[in-house]
Design a protein with these regions (language model features):
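Membrane-interface micro-motifs in multi-pass membrane enzymes
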Residues: 31-38, 93-97, 147-161, 199-201, ...
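Long extracytoplasmic/lumenal interhelical loops at the membrane interface
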Residues: 264-278, 290-333
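A membrane-periplasm/extracellular boundary helix in multi-pass inner-membrane enzymes
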Residues: 196, 217-263, 278-286, 294
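Transmembrane alpha-helices of multi-pass inner-membrane enzymes
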Residues: 42-46, 344, 370-419
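Hydrophobic transmembrane alpha-helices and their immediate junctions
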Residues: 332-375
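Alpha-helical transmembrane segments of multi-pass inner-membrane proteins
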Residues: 24, 102-106, 110-142, 149-219, ...
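Transmembrane signal-anchor hairpin modules in multi-pass inner-membrane enzymes, especially those
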Residues: 1-84, 88, 102-122, 168-181, ...
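Transmembrane-embedded, aromatic-rich helix segments that form part
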Residues: 36-41, 200-212, 337-342
Length: 419
C-alpha cells in the first residue's frame, strides 16, 4: 500500500515537472500550447484536491496570500461590475480574465510539491528562448517572427525568456558548466530574437532589467563601475545599431515618427499610439466609475474621429486596441478596471519583493526572477495590450503562480522571510 501511495505522489511531481519544462517552448511551437499546459496543470491540481496523495501536506493558509488571491480575481470582478452597469453580459472578456483566478489552484498545488520540481524551469526558460530564435523567419520587412504569434508578442516573449535565463544562473546552487552555458545561450538567443523582431516597445524594459540586475546582483557599486557600465552600454548599442539592420531601421523609424509628429503628421505608428492614449484618458474622464464597457472603446472611435479628436486612421486602429493595458482597462471598466490591472502587477510584485529579504538564497533568487518577470510585463503593456491575448494572460498568471509557489514552498528548510 505504501508503495502505491509513494507512486501516486511521485507521479504527480513528475507530471508537474514535465509541464513546467515544456510550457514556455509550447508557447512558441504549438498554437494553443500555453493554454493546453495550463489546463493540464489545473486538472492535476483538481485531482490532488479531490484525492490528496498520502504524505502530501494540506494547504496552510498564509495571510500574505490574501492580496494575491484578490488581485487574481479583480479583473473578472471589474468586468462583471461594468457589464452589470451597461447591461451587456458578453462572455468573451471573461476568457482571458479567467486565467488569473484559475492560476490560484496551480499555486496551491505547486507550493506543496518538492523543490526539485521547479528545477525544470532552469532548462525550460533557455530552451524556449533558443527554440523561438531557431523557429523565427523573416515574413515582412526583414522583421523576424513565427506563425503562431504576432511580431510584438513574439519579440517580448523572447526578451523575457532570455532575461529569465540569465537571472536563473545559480538559482538552485552553483550551476554546472553545461547548464551555465545553456542559460547564457538562452539569454543571447532571446535578446537576438527580440532585436530581430523589431518590437521596440519591449526594448524599453531593457534598462529596467539592467537596473534590477545591478540592484540585486552587484553588492558594491562604485563610480568606476557605473562609468564602465555606461561606456559598455553605449558601445553595445552602437554595435547593435550598426550590425542589425532591423534594429537600425526601427530606431530610425521612431526618430522619423517623432519628427513628423511635430510637423503635424499624426498617422505614424508612434503618433497613432499617442492619439489612442489621449483618447483613452478622455474616455476615462467621461466615464470614471464603470467605463464604457470591457469592449466599448471601439464604439467611441467614430464619434471622436468626427469631433476631430483623433484621425480616421487612428480611429480605425483603435477599434482593435488601445495599445496600452492600463489605459485599456481604465477606459473600459473605469476605476474598477484601473485598480484591477494595477493589482495584477503590484500584488505579486510586492510578494516577490518580500521574498528577496528571505534567509534562503533560493527564495531570494526566485524573488528576483519574479520581480524581473512582472516588471517586464508591466513595461510591455505600456505600448501594446499585451495581456489582451488569452495565451499571454495564461503565460503571465501561470508563471507568476509558479514563481510564487517556489517562494512559498513548504519544503524550504529556512523561514520564508526575516521578521
Amino acid at each position: 500500500m505504501g508503495m502505491v501511495q509513494s507512486r501516486y505522489l511521485s507521479l504527480v511531481e513528475k507530471a508537474a515537472a514535465l509541464l513546467l519544462l515544456i510550457y514556455p517552448t509550447l508557447t512558441f511551437a504549438v498554437k494553443g500550447g500555453m493554454n493546453g499546459v495550463f489546463l493540464l496543470m489545473l486538472l492535476l491540481a483538481i485531482a490532488v484536491w479531490a484525492v490528496r496523495p498520502p504524505g502530501m501536506n494540506t494547504v496552510k493558509w498564509q495571510h500574505e496570500w490574501k492580496a494575491y488571491f484578490l488581485a487574481m480575481g479583480a479583473i473578472a470582478a471589474a468586468i462583471f461590475i461594468s457589464q452589470i452597469y451597461h447591461q451587456n453580459y458578453d462572455a468573451h472578456p471573461h476568457d482571458a480574465a479567467s486565467r488569473y483566478w484559475l492560476a490560484i489552484p496551480v499555486f496551491l498545488l505547486l507550493q506543496r510539491l518538492r523543490l526539485n520540481v521547479f528545477a525544470a524551469l532552469q532548462f525550460a526558460f533557455p530552451v524556449a528562448a533558443i527554440t523561438g530564435f531557431l523557429l523565427a523567419r523573416n515574413p515582412v520587412g526583414g522583421r523576424s517572427g513565427i506563425g503562431t504569434l504576432d511580431l510584438i508578442h513574439f519579440g517580448n516573449f523572447e526578451l523575457i525568456l532570455g532575461v529569465l535565463s540569465l537571472f536563473s544562473i545559480d538559482w538552485f546552487g552553483r550551476d554546472h558548466l553545461p547548464l551555465r552555458i545553456l542559460k547564457i545561450l538562452g539569454f543571447a538567443a532571446g535578446l537576438a530574437a527580440s532585436l530581430a523582431s523589431g518590437s521596440r516597445g519591449g526594448w524599453l524594459a531593457i534598462p529596467v532589467f539592467i537596473a534590477i540586475f545591478f540592484y540585486f546582483k552587484v553588492t558594491r557599486v562604485s563610480l568606476k563601475m557605473v562609468a564602465v557600465s555606461l561606456v559598455s552600454a553605449i558601445l553595445a548599442i552602437t554595435i547593435v545599431y550598426s550590425a542589425s539592420s532591423t534594429f537600425h531601421q526601427r530606431v530610425n523609424e521612431l526618430a522619423n515618427d517623432v519628427a513628423t509628429f511635430d510637423q503635424g503628421n499624426r498617422d505614424t505608428s508612434t503618433g497613432i499610439r499617442w492619439q489612442l492614449y489621449k483618447a483613452a484618458v478622455d474616455v476615462f474622464m467621461r466615464h470614471p466609475v464603470f467605463g464604457v464597457g470591457p469592449e466599448g472603446f471601439a464604439a467611441e472611435m467614430k464619434p471622436m474621429a468626427d469631433a476631430g479628436k483623433i484621425t480616421p486612421k487612428a480611429a480605425e486602429l483603435g477599434r482593435g486596441e488601445v495599445h496600452n493595458d492600463i489605459l485599456s482597462k481604465a477606459a473600459g471598466m473605469g476605476m474598477f478596471g484601473l485598480l484591477a490591472i494595477l493589482a495584477i502587477y503590484f500584488a505579486p510584485l510586492n510578494l516577490f519583493w518580500r521574498a528577496t529579504r528571505s534567509a534562503s538564497e533560493k527564495i531570494k533568487r526566485t524573488g528576483i526572477l519574479g520581480i524581473a518577470f512582472v516588471s517586464g510585463f508591466f513595461v510591455f503593456g505600456l505600448t501594446v495590450e499585451f495581456l489582451n491575448l488569452t495565451m499571454a494572460a495564461a503565460f503571465y498568471s501561470f508563471t507568476v503562480a509558479v514563481l510564487l509557489a517556489a517562494c512559498y514552498n513548504i519544503h524550504h528548510g529556512e523561514p520564508f522571510i526575516k521578521p
